[in-house]
């Protein structure tokens, strides 16, 4: 039986991040799908609720440890399975990497995740086109700032020439932006880095369309 078990959903940005990190570290894990819209959302079912009462994915199981929050999971993986590191061990670069990752995971992503979009349409009666405009507006605002920051930090990847937590966060967010038809040509630095990252096996294998539960 595998020690590492990842509960996720093929299109979840947060689960996508963890898949990338697991692949970069070449860790073998069992993937268990939690369908976010089937049967009212499997994340609300009792079995998953016991794992995470917040009813959000991803959740990582490692032996007796049950951990949620994608960035916490990746930091745990980085400390437990450190080769290769995604968060520098010390120095200013450590905090630069964390800050840029949080720009994506804490500022850009949360206001556009599935439960927010579902609330806009199901509870507030927002039409799909207006919902899509909402999505593009907030992604654009976030990407404008991120583009400017990465112009100063980027080398081959988001921070210099080594893969980091920022790269792990960037690609899933770009994937979602493209799903909602955001014009990525406005962010050439993000676009170039994302294209470079997507060509790497660890990122390609983690892509939503390559997951067993993709539909």
UniProtKB/Swiss-Prot annotation:
Q: Which UniProt keywords apply?
A: Isomerase, Phenylalanine catabolism, Tyrosine catabolism
Which Gene Ontology MF annotations are present? Answer: glutathione transferase activity; maleylacetoacetate isomerase activity
**Which InterPro entries does the annotation name?**
Glutathione-S-Trfase_C-like, Glutathione-S-Trfase_C_sf, Glutathione_S-Trfase, Glutathione_S-Trfase_N, GST_C, GST_Zeta, GST_Zeta_C, GST_Zeta_N
- Name the SUPFAM superfamilies for this protein: GST C-terminal domain-like, Thioredoxin-like
EC top class, as a word? isomerase
What taxonomic classification does the UniProt entry list for its organism?
Bacteria, Pseudomonadati, Pseudomonadota, Gammaproteobacteria, Vibrionales
Q: Which residues form the GST N-terminal domain?
A: 2-85
NCBIfam families named in the record: maiA
EC number(s) on record? Answer: 5.2.1.2
One GO cellular component, as annotated: cytoplasm
Q: In which pathway does it act?
A: Amino-acid degradation; L-phenylalanine degradation; acetoacetate and fumarate from L-phenylalanine: step 5/6
Q: Which domain of life is it from?
A: Bacteria
Question: Could you tell me what this protein is called?
Answer: Probable maleylacetoacetate isomerase
Family annotation (Gene3D superfamilies): 1.20.1050.10, Glutaredoxin
Q: Where is the GST C-terminal domain?
A: 90-215
Among the record's GO biological process terms, what is one? L-phenylalanine catabolic process
Report the sequence similarity comment from the record. Belongs to the GST superfamily. Zeta family.
For this protein, what reaction is catalysed? Answer: 4-maleylacetoacetate = 4-fumarylacetoacetate
